[in-house]
Structure formats: C-alpha cells, structure tokens
Amino acid sequence: MKKLFAAALALIITASAATAQNCWTIARSGAIELDPAAIALPYSDHIEMSGEQVSCVARWSVGADSLYRLERSLVFPALRVIPNNTHGSLMRRVATDILPMVSIDNRTLVQISTSKVSIDGALTSVTLHSVAPGAMPEVEVTQTLFPSTKLPMVCEVYTVKNIAPWDIELNVPEYCQSFCSEASRGVDGAYVVQSDLQGAGSYKLQPGDSASFTMSHQAYRKSGGSPVKPDVKAEYAARMAFIRGDIDSALILHTPDSTINSEFRFAKIRASESIYRTKGGLMHGPGGESYYAATWCNDECEYVNPFYPYLGYSTGNESALNCYLQYAAFQNDEYNPIPSSIIAEGTATWSGVGDRGDAAMVTHGAGRYLLARGSREEAEQLWPFVKWCLEYCRRQLNEQGVPRSDTDELEYRFPAGKANLSTACLYYDGLISAAYLAPLMGESKATAKSYRKQAEALREAIGSYFGANVGGYETYQYYDGNNLLRSWICLPLCFGIDDRAEGTLAALFSDRMMTVDGILTQEGSETFWDRSTLYALRGAFAAGYADEALVQLHNYSQRRLLGTHVPYPVEAWPEGSQRHLSGESGLYCRVITEGLFGIRPTGFDSFDLKINMPSQWSGMSLESIRAFGRDFSIAAERTAKGKIKIDVTCGGKNRTWSIRPGDTVSVKLR
C-alpha cells in the first residue's frame, strides 16, 4: 500500500514541479539573488521586514524596460490611530525615488538597467545609470533598504560607484519631506512621518571610486515628540548583527538539500524580527500591513511561541512569556472563553467569532514552550493558566468525548461544525505536555496520571468521532458530516496519532488537494493557507513518511525561496495576496525541529528524539540548539548496516546511539 502511495505521489510531484518557476539563486554569502537578464520581465514582488518599532512592506519591480522601481509601505505599530483596533497602526506609503534628483557633472542621473536584486535581511538592488537614455553607463548604484532594529525608522543606504573611464563629479541634493496626520485621527493626536537624506554634497570620483549617502523614513508624535537624528550606517550594522548574531549563530541546519537549509535560515529571520515593543511589553505580531501590537491564540500561542526556545532568541522568549501572561489575565471562575486576540498594545481584546478553540491552542503552545524553555520560574507563572485551559477544554467535551468550539482559526471561512479535529488534536497534545509538566510543578502522581488517562480517552474519541472514509481515503472528517477533504486532517499526525497516516497523506498529497503552492484548504476550492501545508509536512515526517515529506518540503521551499514570491512562507491566497505573516515562518522552522528531527520535550532538560531522515540522505545535523537552557547539537548519520547513528553533544560531552529508522530515544541533557 505504501508503495502504491509513493508511486501516485511521484506523478503528482512531477506535474507540480513542471509548473514551478525558479527566478532566484542562493549566493555563497547566504543571500538569494535575482539576475533580471536571466528571467522573463516584468517581475514584481513584495517583502515585509520588521524591527521593534517599525515594519516595512517593500513593493518593488523590474519592468520590461529593466528599470528598478520601489514603493515603501511604512507601519508604526506603537503610533495608534482611531479606531484603535486590530488594524489601528499608523501607516504611510512612500514612493519617492531620490536618484533622479542626483546629478553627474550637473546632468540628471538616468537609470539604464538593473543588474541584480538580492535579499539577506535587507533588500538590495544594483542598477546602472548614465546621463541620457541609451548612453554608456557611468555609475553603478547599490541601494539597500532595511528596518531599524530599535527605532521607528526605515533606512536606506545608497552607494554610487564610478564605472566610467573618466573622473566625474557626483552631486547629491538636500532633501526632506514630511507629512502630518490629522490630530483627530490619532490616539495621541497628530503624527509626523518624515523622510530625510543624509550625506548631501558634491563628490569627485575617479574611476572605481565610490561615495555613499543615506535616507531615513521615521515617524513621531507631533506633541511631545521629535525626529531622531539618524546614523543609518550604525542602523545597518545593528540589523546585520541581528542577522549574523541572533539568527545565524544558533539553530544551524545542515542537510544535503541547500534549498531547505536556506529557507530554514530565512524563516528564522522572519519569525524573529516581527516582535514589537509596545506599552504592553514585547508583542509578536503577524504583520501583513494589518496585524501589529497584538497577539492571537493561534499565530502566537500556538504557532511561533513554541519555536523560540530552540533558537534561544531572548527577545522571542520574552515576547512569548508576555503573550501567555496577557492571556492568563482572562482566566475566570466561570470558565468563559478567553479572547481570541489581545489587541491595541494589550489594552483591548477581540473575540468576534466566538470560541475558536483558543484554550486548546494555548494548551498545545504553552505546554511545549514551557518544557523546551526549561525555566522553572516561567513555568510556575504559567502553570495555573495551563491547568485552567485544560479544564476549560474538558468542560467542552461532548457526549462523544471531543471538545466543542464555535469555529476554528479560519473563523467561518470554511465550515467547522460544532466540534472540529483541530481543537481536539491541540487539546490532546496539551494533555500530553501537562502530564510531563505536572510532576515538575509539584503535582501529585495522580494528577499526571489523570492527564494521561484523559489524553488516552481523547485519542480514542478522535479516532471514533472523526475517523472516516472521505473521498475514498481512510482518513478523517474535519467535523461530523464533513464529506470533503480538508487540509487540517494532517493534525493527528503531528501529535503521534498515526493510525490513519497512510490514507491521510495519500489524500493530502493527491492531485485533489496538493498544488504547486501547497495544500488546498478544502477539496474543490482554490484557497490555500500555508499554515496547514506546514503542519502537514511536519506530520508527514513525524509519522515516518520522510521520503514523501522530503519531496514536498523541497518543492515548497524552492517555491517560497527561489520562485516568484520570496523569500518567506506566506499567509494565504487569494486572501491577503500572500502576505509574509511571520507565524508561518515559525511553523516552517518547526517542520525541522519537530518533524525532521522529531524533538518532543518531556521535561525541563529532557526530550524524546525520533530522527526522521529521508532514505537518500547520508546525514544531517542541527547545531547550537538553545532549548532546555542549554546549547547542544544533534547529528544523525546513516551507517553501513542500515542503522542511524545519533550524536548529541552538550557542554563538551557527547552521547551516541545506534538505532533503527523510526525508533525513538530518550535524551536527558546533563
């Protein structure tokens, strides 16, 4: 049966690969690069980049004329507008092109062509310019756009290089543009958005010489605020320190697949940069020109927070703890639902569609976060809330033993019935984590045993209530009466419920569900959400279908990293035009940590390890893992006898196992 599934999958993969288009290449530096001369033009794209007080969606293109164009959409999450709701961040678009104001020998600079575009924590273009259309290029301009790591500011660095065989005089004008919003529209009155050029003047450049100037786009309160005098080059150094230090020095993936390695690195960037400093503390926000200074039970509690301990990014861990504590404030004696979202810098909430299974999302995410974080202090703060959420879910059980909820994270976009598979699976995983946490929190053996018994009963109920033949596949109905395949049928596989793994993956990877952009939300629709595709990939690895999962993960990574919309996982289509929401990047990283490497936390310093290495790989490693309060590495190597040799190195000490593929080992870090 598994061979038949693999054969059918191969046909689907071949068809999908034929429709994919690679536009980018991976450079030795780790950046991705676009050569406009090597692709069909015009080409256009958008990318989001963020810092603690700003986010920028850069919409850029290389036209059929090979000219580079850029528009910046600036978002300032802590500058709130009225109505101060989910979407109440100050926003302003800036399309100013400063280069036509620059001159060479008193003649206007004219762009001739684009040589290269690259992305590596910043958006960089290299363009050629002269003083007349069609004339020989005289200068090469490198323009780099990036967000400040700490300030409400987006920055640009321009470097102009003389590529002519003669001396030139470069003239850069003074430039300042400001916009003042209406006081009646701002929570704190009027706001000023100001763009400034630094480095104006005349520069004599011999052949091969370069000169640089910079621009900044910032915002501040008109009353009581003032513009910052920017040091753009220092801001660039800080941005690169974040990329090279916080991101590149931890959780380093090595596999034979360079595309997956690179996309994992880029996903680490997006998952970690989208954290905003607000009056409510550090708050991760999905982004997408919509979701800032706010958290959700799915995007943050469920998707991205459990990832941060592995990276060891202190800002991420702080935002995760703050997120859970904010929701903990809403536990109540009546066991009414917690809000789905905490918005407006933590000052308001949103629960517009009722209970989405939010407490189940928290139990899954917080349980895994606390175990992987390895901090007793944090666990003591959150354990009462975790127990409350578990009890809330228990009280929602229907007569068949699965939890009720009004809807799910898709919020009525697609039907979810009165009880859905997503809420049930998340609650199940929360119970498993609680059984591990309980003794660490001083609970009795009976308490831990109770959580395990509840998990066992729920697992059985999931099989009996949701297990079904849908469309000819032995898989799951997403809700009672559902007769169309749904993407979220992948969830049981992520949490060790693999009774129907083969039929489920055959359904998900069939041509009825799988597309070049991932898995359809529902059979027969045109809608896809990356989040369920990423869960499915994690589940496929976890269930032992590593070869099938690898092909799909490679295709997905190639599409997102090197295709026509790069370089991060996206939210959805057609909704949102494939915005780079950052929670999905956290889910990509968890495909690796929890799927490929099969890490399942079991204590503050222990985990189960189930290496799910594809058969065509001879080895792989994950280095400098910062979870459990340690810095350790995992390496897996296939031996001549068909076994897998595992090395776990921590604190200068190495432990080795030799296992059969599919076996699980229990690791305790000492």
What are these regions (language model features)?
Residues 1-21:
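Bacterial Sec-dependent N-terminal signal peptides
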Residues 91-100, 299, 323, 358-365, ...:
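Amphipathic, well-ordered alpha-helical segments in soluble domains
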Residues 244-380, 388, 407-409, 484-494, ...:
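Substrate-binding groove/exosite segments of carbohydrate-active enzymes
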Residues 275-278, 331-336, 394-404, 464-471, ...:
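Proline-centered turn/helix-capping motifs that create local helix->coil transitions or kinks
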Residues 264, 268-271, 448-466, 556:
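Short amphipathic alpha-helical coiled-coil/interface segments
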Residues 296-321, 325, 380, 384-387, ...:
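Active-site core of glycosidic bond-cleaving carbohydrate-active enzymes
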Residues 204-233, 284, 288-294, 339-361, ...:
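The feature captures the catalytic groove of carbohydrate-active enzymes
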Residues 18-262, 545-549, 557, 599-670:
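Terminal accessory carbohydrate-recognition/targeting modules of carbohydrate-active enzymes
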